[in-house]
Amino acid sequence: MVTANLPWGKIGFTICFDLRFPELYRNLSKKNLSFIAVPSAFTKFTGQKHWLTLLRARAIENFCYIFAPAQTGRNTPKRETFGHTAIISPDGKILALKKLGKGVIYSKIKPKLSMDLRKIIPSLI
C-alpha cells in the first residue's frame, strides 16, 4: 500500500480495478488518510453501471476524499473508456465532475472533515 504525506494531510494510492476491493480501502484508511487517489480507465459499459457508485461507496465507508482521474474516449476500435473524472467528499457528495474529454476539475476541500466524521461516526474500528 502506497501513501504519501502532503502539506494538508495523508494520501493513499490505488488504481482502477482496486476500486472493487473495499478491504484494500479499509486497510488504507487505517493509516490515518484523508485522501485516496484512484486513477482509472473503466470501460464505458462497466463505468456507466459502477464507477460513481463505487467511488461514493469507498468515500463513505472510509470517510476519505476520493480523487478519481479517469481516462475518456475511444482507445481502440473495440475499447471505449467511460471518463467521468471526479472528486468525492468523505460523506459521498460529488464535489466536481468532468464527464468526458480533456480537462481539469477542482473543488474546495476541508482536510479536517475526514477526521471529524470518524469521530462522529466511529465505524472504522
Per-segment meaning from a language model:
Residues T3-N5, I87, Y106-K108:
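Short, well-ordered beta-strand micro-motif
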Residues R20-I105:
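CN hydrolase (nitrilase-like) catalytic-core segments centered on the catalytic cysteine
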Residues M1-K31, K44-T53, P111, M115-I125:
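Active-site catalytic loop in hydrolytic enzyme cores
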